[in-house]
Amino acid sequence: MDYSKTLRLPQTEFPMRGNLPQKEPQFVELWQDKDLYNKRIEKRKKEGAPRFVLHDGPPYANGKIHIGHALNKTLKDIIVRYKYMAGYMANYIPGWDTHGLPIEYAVLKDSGEDRANMSVLELRRKCLEYAKKWIEIQKTDFIRMGVIGDFDNRYVTFDPHLEAKEIEVFGEMARKGYIYKGKKAVYWCSHCETALAEAEIEYKDRKSPSIYVKFPAKNIKGLGPEGVDQSKLFAVIWTTTPWTIPANQYISVNPKFTYVWVHNLDADEYYLMNKELAPAALADCKIENYEFAGREMTGAEWELAEFMHPWASYNRTVYVLEGNHVTLDAGTGCVHTAPGHGVDDFEVYKKYENEGKLKQEVICPVDNKGRMTAEAGSFLEGKTVWEAEGPSISALAHEGMLLGKKSLHHQYAHCWRCKNPVIYRATEQWFASINDFREDALKAVDATRFIPSWGHDRLYNMIRDRQDWCISRQRSWGVPIPAFYCDGCGSYVITPETIASVKEIVEKEGTDAWWAHPAEELLPKDFKCPHCGGSRFHQEKDIMDVWFDSGSTWNGVLKDPHPVWKDTGAAYPCDLYLEGSDQHRGWFHSSLLTSVAVNGCAPYKAVLTHGFTMDGEGRKMSKSVGNVVAPQDIIDKYGADVMRLWISSVDYQGDVRLSDKIVKSMSDVYRKIRNTFRYLLGNLYDFDPKTDSVAYGDMEELDRWALLRLEQVKRTVLKAYEDYEFHVMYHAVHNFCTVDLSSIYLDILKDRLYTEKDDSLLRRSAQTAMYEILTSLVRLVAPVICFTAEEVWQALPNREEREWSVHMADMPAENDRYLDKALEEKWKKRLALRSVVTKALEEARRAKVIGHPLDAEITIYADGEHLETLKAMEKELADFCLVSQAKISGDLSAAPENAFASEDGTVKVSIAVCTLEKCERCWKRTPDVNSDPKHEHVCARCAKVLTEMGE
C-alpha cells in the first residue's frame, strides 16, 4: 500500500518563491483600488481613536530617489503602519520641497538659456513644470516601495495655501520685530550669484595658500620694545585667503592672551605675536634666529592701537580690536580682520560701532560674480577672487610685507548645488534676529524628546551658538520677501496690513502674483507710506531661503491646514519629525526657529534621526567610485520587501552599510521568514478556528511552550516598535522563525501533523497553536514586509471573518495566560538537553554513523537535575529528539569513550544505528511494527490511525 496518501502533508497555494518584483505591484493596485489609506482613517475616526501625526520632511523635487530617500521613507512608513495597527488614527501627508536654487539651476542648465534673457515669470513657469515632473516620478517610486499616505493630497511648497501661510509666518515675525534688513558678511556663491545659509554649505578638502603678513606699526601707544625705532615694528597676521587682504581694516587680538615682541635677529625686525603661537609661526616662516624682547603684554593693552595696511598705496590705518573669536588653534594670535569677508570680522567691528568707538564703511571690493572691483586696485580689478590670490601675494612680497608662505589642505565651504567654493561677502540682506527669541528656542529644544538622545545637545548647541539667519536669496524661483519700498523716502515697508493683503492674493493666485502685479495692486487700497505718507511703491526682488519655506510647513499643514487635510492633518505640535542627522542644522532647525518665533513652542514633540547610507566597507556612495546601490535596482531584482527588511535590520541611528552582498544576504533571511509562513499556512488547510480550536488548558505542553515563545516575541516586537528600535524587532522575528519555530517547534511537530488523524486532539492542538502564531506573526511583521504580510493575510483560512487587509487589522493583543513561568523554566532545561543531542546527531551524521536521525537509537547519560528532567519526559523523549529510540542512564561513567559530551561534561550522548524495523508510514523504527495484521509494515500507532480513517 502507498501510505504517503494517508499522510496529512502540507497544502497551500502560497508559493515558495516570492516573485516580489512582479507580485508587489498587484498589492499596490489593490490598496489603491480599495482606498486603503482613507479606509484606515475612516475606521479610526469612527472609533474616536487618538491621533498620531508624523510630519513629512519634504524631499527636494529634483532627480530620482536614492537609497537615502528609501531609508527615510521606509522608516516613516514602518512607524505610520505600526501606529495605525496599535490603535491610532495615524496620518501621513507626504510633501515636497519645490523652490530654490537647485531647481532654478537645473532649469537654466537644461534649457541652455541665460537667466538675464528670461523674464522672471517665464523662468518660474519652467521651474514649476520641472518640479511637478519630478514630484510625479518620485511619488511613483515611493508608492512602489510600499509607502502608504495621502498622495492624492500631498503638500508642495509651491502650493498657494502653503505660500500664503509662509508669508503669514514672515509677517508675524516682522510684527514682533524679528525681521530686519542690513549689511552683513554672509556665505556667497559667486557662480549662483546668491547668498547661502549654513544649511546650504558642504565642506570639501581644498588646497589654499597660507601666508604670514607684516603690518607696519603706526601708533602703538608706547607698547614697543624700549629704544627700538618704530620702523622696525610689525604686527604679523596669518591668513589662507590672500584675496581678502585688500579688504583688511583691522587686526583682532584676544584681550586675555599674552603677547610678546619677537626679535628676528637676522632681519633686525620685531614682530607682535601671541607667546604660545610664536614658535610654530616662526617655524612656518623659516625664522630660526630669534629672541623675545621687551615685556609680556595682554591683548587688552593693544585695543585701538594703530598699524598700517601692508600695501603702502592704500594709506589705510588698521586698528587693533578685541575679539573673543581669536583662539590658539593656529596663526599668530593677531587675526586678519576684514568685516566685508568674515562673520566674526563683521561682528567684532559692529560691536565697536555700536559702542561708538569706531565708525567706518565696511570694505567689500568683490562683486556678485566674485570678481575684484576697482576698490581693490587696478592690478586686481576684474580678476576672480581665486585669480587674485597670486597677484596679492606677489604684491605683498614686492612691498617686503610677506613674512612666510606655504600651502595648506583644509576643509573649505562649497555651494551645495554648483559645488564651487564660496566666499564670505558683506551685502544687504534680510535677516531673522535670533537673539530676540534664542532663550525660548533653547527651552523648546529642552522640551523635545530626541531619538537618539544626543540629538538634543547637537541642536541645542547649534541654536545657542548661531548667528542671525540670512533669509533672503537673490533668485527668482521661490516665495518673495513680502516687503515694499517707498519711492518717496526709500524706506522699506512691512506692516500687518500689507502682509494681510499679500497673503490674501497669494492664497488665490500663488506667488506669481508678486511679479505679475504692480505694487499698488498688491497693497491695501489707498495705502500710504507710514514713514513719509508717500503712495508710490515697488516690490522687493529677493526671495526667501528654501529653509524658510520648508521650515514654515508646520503652519500650512499642521496648525492651519488646507481644508482637504483638516480632519487628518491638523495636529500642532505634531508627534514626530524624522529625518537624517544632517537636518539638525536644516529642517529641524529652521522649523524650530519659525515655530518658536511665532508661537513660542517647537512644532514637534519628538525628533528622530537616522544616519547616512554607506557602501559595504563604510565608504560614502559615489557614482565615480561605482559603489552606489540604487533602491530601484534592489526592488527590480529582489522586491521592495527585501529592501524594507534590510532597513528594519540595521541600527539606523548611526550610519548604515549596504552592498549587493548585503542585499543578497537579506534576501536569504527573507526567504526563511517566507518559508515559515508557507509552512504554517500549509498545515492549516483543513483547520477552522471556530470549530477546531483546542482550549489552552487542553493543549499539548509543546504547543503551550510555542505560545509562550510567541507571547515573549510579541512583547519584544511591540516594545521595539514603540521605541523605534526596528532592528530589535527584526532580530526577534528572525530568531523566532529560524530557531524557535523551524529548528525546534515545527521540526518536532511534523510527525504529529502528518501522521495523526486529521481531527485528533494531538493534531488540532498543534493547529490551534500554529493558527495563533500565524495570525499574530503576520501582523507583527506587517509594518515592515508589508507586501508579503498582505499575501499571507489573503491566504489565511476564514478570510471573510477578518479585515479585508492586514493593514486594516490591529496588532495582536497581549495574553498574560501564555506567560507560564513554570513552563518556561521547564522547557529551558529540556531544550538545553535537546541541543546536546542535536549536536551529537550532527556529528554522527558527519561521521556517517547514521543517515537520517530516525535511523538512530540514542542513550543519554546524566545525573542530578538533568536526569530528573529526562525522566519527566521519558515517554516523549524520542519524539522530542527526532530519533526512533531514546534511553536514559543515570550513570555518567557508563558512557562509552566515543560518546558526545556537553561543554561542561554533565551530559553525554551515545548514538547507535537502530536495528528495529522501520514503519513505512512514519519512518520510525519501533518494536511494534507489523503488530496489526491488517496493516503490514507499519507501527501500532499508525495502524490505529489507519483503522480510524477506514483504511
Regions found by a protein language model. Give the residues of each.
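Cys/His-coordinated zinc-binding microdomains
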Residues: 193, 474, 490, 533, ...
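Protease-associated
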Residues: 250, 257-334, 343-347
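Short cysteine-rich clusters marking metal-coordination/redox-active sites
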Residues: 189, 415, 486, 529-532, ...
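Residue patterns forming the tRNA-binding/recognition surfaces of aminoacyl-tRNA synthetases
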Residues: 2-20, 26, 30-34, 108-246, ...
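Secondary-structure capping and boundary motifs in well-ordered enzyme cores
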Residues: 46, 50-57, 67-71, 75, ...
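Residues immediately within or flanking Cys/His clusters that coordinate Zn2+
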Residues: 186, 412, 483, 526, ...
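Acidic, turn-prone loop/beta-hairpin segments
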Residues: 97, 190, 197-202, 537, ...
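N-terminal catalytic cores of NTP/NDP-binding nucleotidyl/phosphoryl-transfer enzymes
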Residues: 43-106, 157, 237-244, 319-348, ...
